């Protein structure tokens, strides 16, 4: 069984864990929407003091542009340097794994008074994640203010190769401005 480094920066929480089968060898997090950059290396360093890893898994969003880039770039660089595989998983799916209902919706803060969301039936995502105003998201029980379950992130199949950005970044390159 491989030891997996799990990373998620798709919410305001920077989360890191080392999972060995069903055992959580290390788990740590730091809260703060702008803390991903300084928090992630410190958490990974702390985790590696406990155990080495054979694989990486990273939450691919949806989430804020910069937060996602920090987590994904770190996971890919770490895996490349260690010559281990890394795979990407939809972060909303790893949140949904905590809910035991027939039909439900997972929402996370997208800032700008919006939410990233996805609908689930029997724990399986129905359709693609989206971004809307909270008032526009309805039709099932809504679960908000939850964070990614890193054990679920590791258990889920991961074949996502591109970050799940649901809107363009705020910054626009000078050359691309009208």
What is each PLM-predicted segment?
Residues 43-55:
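Phosphate/pyrophosphate-binding loops at sites that engage ATP/ADP/AMP, CoA/4′-phosphopantetheine
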Residues 1-24, 31-39, 81-178:
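Oxyanion-binding and handling regions
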Residues 38-41, 72:
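Conserved active-site region of classical short-chain dehydrogenase/reductase
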Residues 52-61, 135-143:
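Short glycine-rich phosphate-binding loop at a beta-alpha junction
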Residues 27-32, 60-64:
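A short glycine/serine-rich beta->alpha loop
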Residues 56-86:
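DPxDG-like acidic metal-binding loop motif
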Residues 44, 75, 92:
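Generic structural marker for isolated residues within well-ordered, non-membrane alpha-helices
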């Amino acid at each position: 069984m491989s030891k997996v480094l799990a990373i998620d920066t798709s919410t305001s929480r920077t989360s890191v864990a080392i999972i060995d089968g069903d055992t959580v060898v290390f788990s740590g997090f730091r809260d703060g929407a702008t803390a991903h950059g300084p928090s992630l290396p410190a958490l990974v360093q702390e985790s590696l003091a406990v155990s080495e890893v054979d694989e990486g898994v990273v939450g691919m969003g949806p989430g804020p542009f910069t937060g996602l880039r920090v987590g994904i770039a770190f996971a890919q660089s770490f895996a490349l340097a260690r010559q281990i595989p890394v795979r990407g998983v939809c972060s909303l799916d790893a949140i949904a794994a905590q809910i035991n209902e027939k039909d439900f919706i997972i929402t996370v803060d997208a800032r700008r008074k919006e939410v990233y969301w996805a609908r689930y039936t029997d724990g399986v995502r129905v359709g693609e994640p989206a971004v809307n105003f909270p008032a526009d998201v309805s039709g099932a029980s809504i679960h908000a203010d939850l964070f990614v379950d890193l054990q679920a992130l590791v258990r889920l199949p991961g074949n996502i190769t591109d970050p799940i950005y649901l809107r363009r970044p705020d910054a626009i390159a000078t050359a691309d401005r009208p």
